[in-house]
Amino acid sequence: MGISTLMVAVLVNPVMHLVTVAGIICLMLSAFLANFFRDPDRVIPKEAGILVSPADGHVMFAVRERATGRRPSKEEQSNCENHPLTGDWHPEACEETLSFQTEQRWVPVEVGGESDDDCWRVAVFMSPLDVHVNRACEAGTIVAMEHRTGKGKRRGPFLPAFKKESEFNERVRTVLETESGIRVEMTQISGAVARTIVPWTGVGTTLRRGERYGMIRVGSRVDLRAPANIFKPVVIGA
């Protein structure tokens, strides 16, 4: 469209150069969209016992965490804590924390206070210039998916994805059980600009390591949680 507009600008007498300016803007927008929706192939590592990043981008942080609460069931609504940003929490974690049965409330673990129920969380921020197609961190089967909107708004609050607090933006949580029976949690999180999470799979889908399972449009982030007694984070620059 941008090229067509520029051709029109050359063939006709431009009005205050508005046609030329419009053509340049359209050309730039087309280039941005083509860059954003690119989906190049990736060389997926084949080493056993590792998890690969579910997203292209920059690692915001890697933190060891422990669950201190979970989303309440209907029977537990009378015994829950309310947070104005994050919503209602039952003040006990899941009986099997690392089963990731529902969304849990996590807190950082201090050095010296580690336990076998801890997990590592690695947060990957995707800028508008990064590839926004997300991939499975390991081969396995999706055993749970959960969509949550931001607290207090229809889909918001849409905090910038590079902020830690953005973990409570609109999000889709996917639990993958690997071939060895280990469960990991991948959470696609919308950002201030990216407001559309597009899952391409569902519960029961079997994925290969590195297989595409969804995307988030424009700027956003993906969090990966994995058992800390099995994995440890290693950041390797591309």
Regions found by a protein language model. Give the residues of each.
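Contiguous, well-folded functional domains in the mature portion of proteins
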Residues: M1-A238
